[in-house]
Amino acid sequence: MASHTLRPHRSPSPSPEPPVNLANPAKLTRQSLGPPTSGNSKGFGSLGLGPGLASPSSPSQPRHVSSSVAMGMGNRDSLSPRPSGVGSGRAVSATTGPRPSSEFIPTREAKTPEAEQIDQWFKHLANWEATLEEMAAASTDQNFTEELGAIEQWFRVLSEAERTAALYSLLQYSTPVQIRFFISVLHHMSQSDPMSALLSPSLSGSNAFQTQVESKLSNMNLKSPSAGGGAGFAGSSGNGHYLAPDDAAAKAAKARQNRISAPGTLQPHDRWQGQLDQVVERGTSPGLESNMSGRSRSKSPTPEPRPKSTDFSGKPRESLRRESAAFPRSPRVSAGSPGIGLGIGHESPMASPFGNNASWASMVNTPLVQNFNDGKLVAPASVADLSQALNMATLQLNNPGYLPLDDARKYRRPTGGLASGQTSRNVSGQYNDDGEIVNPHTTQPGTPSGLLPNQFGGGRSPLVDQFGLGGLGIGADSTTLANLGLNYNLAGLGGVNPGLNGLTAAQAQAAQMLAMQQQLQNSQYSPFNASAPSLQPGLNPSRRGAGRGQSSHLNQHYNQHQQQHQPGRRSPNPLKSHSPAPGQQTGGGGAGGGAGVAGPEDVDVKVLEDVPNWLRVLRLHKYTPNFEKSNWNDMVLMTDQDLQDNGISAQGARTKFLKVFYNVRTKMDIAHPPGQEEYAPGPKESK
């Protein structure tokens, strides 16, 4: 009964083989670890291991496996994983052949060259994957992208020979893995290049036409539909690969194209998944009907169009529709696009206003005020419009086109050499108190610079000129315009003949309204009302020159009265007090300011008593902390050495102090310290 047990024998049995069950050849009468008798129906026949592995003498006989062989203690020559020939293995009996390789347990030393090649290939694949991941991570780095863009800009300006030399030099630093990567990339690029088919020796007449078509497409920077290729290689639809000749320019054009300030065109694959860009133009936007028809074929939800309240054009919908059909308004809107939004769109010739076929008018925004006037003077519609226009003109006259700062008079450098009693605030005669070049014979300080008769200069309002105020004979002097408000009410214009010199009733009314405005603003000149001359001689419409001469007379009379009643000029800053006039106690201009710069006559005791103000008039206020505990009596007795001991190290400042001190001592009859005669006013005596 031992022959029917499932455990194999320790040694091959010398007894004859049991009979084979014909109904089931795989079911043996005596169980063993050997393969079934029929290898074609079941067992190893399905694995492709044919009957050649069995003994040719008995192909259908089962074989026994001893325990020693099953434990791997057989001959080492029989442990090869490759099937060996007949009689190459150790036979367990006189009739046994080589056993199949699946019965052996291979050791660690048994490795085939194919397995080693596969392992090496997997190692390279893992290395390539890591390299590609690092390349993808580096391409997202902003610093690397900027540096690479600079390299691309430099690469674009090189010639073909220089590009080839540069690439060849860079390839010398490649690692073996990079070399294999470059080989694969270049092989792929050569396959997608249509010129490779043209230069191939196996070119036949059947594909000659296709080759010519691909060559033409490549010259036009288009990709052939039959050519292979992926993203990043030559011939592909994407032009974003690195070190491309036109990549830098394409990126710059794309950056200009993808502006958020204009509605863009988005394809479905270019959209973000969010709904922030689903902004549709108003109903009268050009191309909206075609866009909505294109949207009806899409399953994506479409936002509602803008309401009619956003249409600020004021035109009927039919006229806007005709205008939109005539020419497109937006360069980014295309009729075939499935959606309109704010985002990244495809490049188009009209994407940028700086294209070859774009108009210069699209390079700037539409101005709110028209640039070209037709030259027609439109009369005011009502008295309210006239009053508003006059208010604007008055505002521009009183507020010139510069920012009023501190009083510029106190920063003027004093100059000597004037005759006694001839001191003036404008010493040089070339600049007024605002630092503007003026003519001292015709223009008073404080008036706009460069004013000619019947002109306003930089601050002139076209509204005043529109009403023809030049015909009033008042010229362009803002001071003369101010004189209109010196109690020249509506009754004062009774002598004006509106029918002469083109002076219409509307223009006369404009002059009256302007006079009323000026009267309200110049109310501080009320003492001048009683002595105001009549304006009627200045409004003689026969000659404009006579009116201008009368305006000069009015200016002179007004300036004389201003020196009597309103000494000094008004500071452009309303929060500051008026600057003093010549000869006043708080003069602000060195010569003539009472500080003693111009001579002994230019000394005012009230100015000297306020030491900080005295130093400010002398433009030496930076030394105010040096004289905090001093009065003018002690200061005028100082010598050059005393000033140095007091902390005044600048030679120019000490000289100016000593000259002023000499004038003050002369005015106050104070004895001069010894050695101070050199600071006396007048020409220096040559030694």
UniProtKB/Swiss-Prot annotation:
Residues 585-597 have a biased composition (Gly residues). Residues 52-68, 550-566 have a biased composition (Low complexity). Keywords: Cytoplasm, RNA-binding, Translation regulation. Residues 606-667 form the SAM domain. Residues 305-324 have a biased composition (Basic and acidic residues). Residues 1-115, 248-341, 526-598 are annotated as: Disordered. It is found in: Cytoplasm, Cytosol; Cytoplasm, P-body. Residues 29-41, 287-301, 526-539 have a biased composition (Polar residues). GO terms for cellular component: cytosol; P-body. It holds the Pfam family Vts1. Gene3D superfamilies: Transcription Factor, Ets-1. Residues 1-10 have a biased composition (Basic residues). InterPro entries: SAM, SAM/pointed_sf, SMAUG/VTS1_RNA-bind, VTS1_SAM. GO terms for molecular function: mRNA binding. The keyword Lyase does not apply. SMART domains: SAM. GO terms for biological process: nuclear-transcribed mRNA poly(A) tail shortening; regulation of translation. Its main location: cytoplasm. Belongs to the VTS1 family. Monomer. Binds to RNA. This is RNA-binding protein VTS1. It comes from Cryptococcus neoformans var. grubii serotype A (strain H99 / ATCC 208821 / CBS 10515 / FGSC 9487).
